[in-house]
């Protein structure tokens, strides 16, 4: 039976506040539902459009892949054992031959030789030898054995110089440099500015062969030539040397070297291309120039210009090379994040011609793209394709596959397999590999191993913002002991190599560093076993990073830092971190924003232990919390005396508000939830949100709306959650993934009207967004076709 509390006693008929973060206004009466007895509880019915069958098939495919890969490795090990056995047999045979040969030599040495023959031979050899005394008595100007006396050559200082350049340099350039050749002695520290200055004073490029000039320009490294282009152009102009297309290509390669290219650099490169078209008889660019242009546009994240270059190459009947396709593929994966375009380019490389077949780098980029788009199944298929086609596999591919396997519970064990394959192939793990080992242990909730990896990176002075973010992720994912809850062992412990690997890493952790400067504020225990320990250590790590590595702190780290408190701490802990480590950036916010203060229902009170009373300042409330808190770092408590700590806050993002709603739902605090969605409405009017693309805005709004529905559901405010669904039904694509929690809560209390409305929303979404045919349309189709 369903129990509904009276709405009159507690003023529950008040309207829900206006929600600024969504289109339109939502007004609905509030009802609090109490869960009835579990006896006879109806089960959740699956909809016809449910994807459970697809999920089961996907799990079966993953299991089949794991089994087949295990069989492949077993066969590979069997072949390896047979090879080693053959090597052992051949080694045994060769050792036997060596021993037999040695025995034969010993037998020959045992045969006695006539002493007379030995004695005569010694006399003959002694008479033929010339002693050192005889050699010393010979005159110095004695003729040679051939009877021809060699004449001494005249000394040439240029041929006997003690200074030689570390790079190949044309002889004509070397003569003009003179003593400035000393600037070219060290290959790593060449002062090219002084070299060009001395060359200019020695006559520059006047009268030098064009081939020697090109060789000299080719010898300048790409990372330095961009700063020397004005001097080189002046030398070419003074020497009446025309800038050929090959020299200009060197300039373009120098300008496009490095990471991101600005629009100014692209404009300068385009000017050089226009110059090439003018000096070229046919007015066309070469294949090399097009490849350099595509590489430059890729670093500028300009896919439109890349497509224009490809169209021009097609018009000029220039087939793109494998290098060109690889540059475009890398741009789509790492710069533009265009997975669809990346897949099309990769397929073109496979089927266009034999010359453009993808190599290891191309497979690496497309596997990373599939992993980034949560399609580890396709990434594993490509990995198997590389094995079948005998394409070389590198360490980055293994790391990407390990990272992707963490997204599937069925493949958590397989993720560490890929990591251990790096050691099996005798590869030296890179910093990127160590960081993702930390990531794997963090996703597994293995705080002890994550702390050990972070400590190892700290000892090597190799800590990066990414590794710090992964450590915070480990704190938030940690499985601490709770009454009545079991702890799952990390997947690495189910692996024989993994157990040994984990034990060796943990046994080598130094929790007491010799130097305080290089130390990190870890608790002096091997593992953290309580939420208080996790909250305290994460707060200490945050304060330590703010003081010594402030550049590591970014929006991702701040959101993870908030999530630790949302999962492990109390509501006071979360509010303290929310206010002290993040802030609302009001850039772009107009001054005419209205603030509406509505009275809260009396039935919903704050769950915080410390609440602000009338006349009490925020600072006094904060100081009171700091005095009582045992999990907040003393450095963060005394922010006033720590210069700069109080100003090192991170601007909030949409994810920050989602995490805040999760904390409000966990503690069922409606007051804090109302504050969050009110501030989220203000955040939508700031530049940080308005500058985003339309699709990104819609995705973030849907994420927050889903968090609101989940928050209200956990507070048992089912009518409010349903009101949000009804008001945004045609704005967002609601699926059973988001609706299942509310539907389950409504079915538990036999709220049939809510269940019916939720099913209707899911059904209409399948028709509007998924292209599902209506029942009446299907009947009409059958009637017209006759079957």
From Swiss-Prot:
Main location: mitochondrion
Compositional bias segments (type: Basic residues): 38-48
Transit peptide, residue positions per record: 1-12
PPR repeats (start-end): 286-320, 321-356, 359-393
Miscellaneous information on this protein: Involved in mitochondrial-nuclear incompatibility, a major determinant in reproductive isolation between species, through hybrid incompatibility of Ccm1 and its interacting partner 15S rRNA between yeast species.
Residue ranges, annotated region (Disordered): 38-58
Protein name stated in the entry: Mitochondrial 15S rRNA processing factor CCM1
Subcellular location: Mitochondrion
UniProt subunit comment: Binds to mitochondrial small subunit 15S rRNA.
Swiss-Prot/TrEMBL GO biological process terms: mRNA processing; RNA splicing
Family as reported in the entry's similarity comment: Belongs to the CCM1 family.
A cellular component term, taken from the record's GO annotations: mitochondrion
Function: Regulates mitochondrial small subunit maturation by controlling 15S rRNA 5'-end processing. Localizes to the 5' precursor of the 15S rRNA in a position that is subsequently occupied by mS47 in the mature yeast mtSSU. Uses structure and sequence-specific RNA recognition, binding to a single-stranded region of the precursor and specifically recognizing bases -6 to -1. The exchange of Ccm1 for mS47 is coupled to the irreversible removal of precursor rRNA that is accompanied by conformational changes of the mitoribosomal proteins uS5m and mS26.
Keywords: Mitochondrion, mRNA processing, mRNA splicing, Repeat, Transit peptide
Source organism, top-level taxon: Eukaryota
InterPro entries found in the cross-reference section: Pentatricopeptide_rpt, TPR-like_helical_dom_sf
Record PROSITE patterns: PPR
Organism: Debaryomyces hansenii (strain ATCC 36239 / CBS 767 / BCRC 21394 / JCM 1990 / NBRC 0083 / IGC 2968) (Yeast)
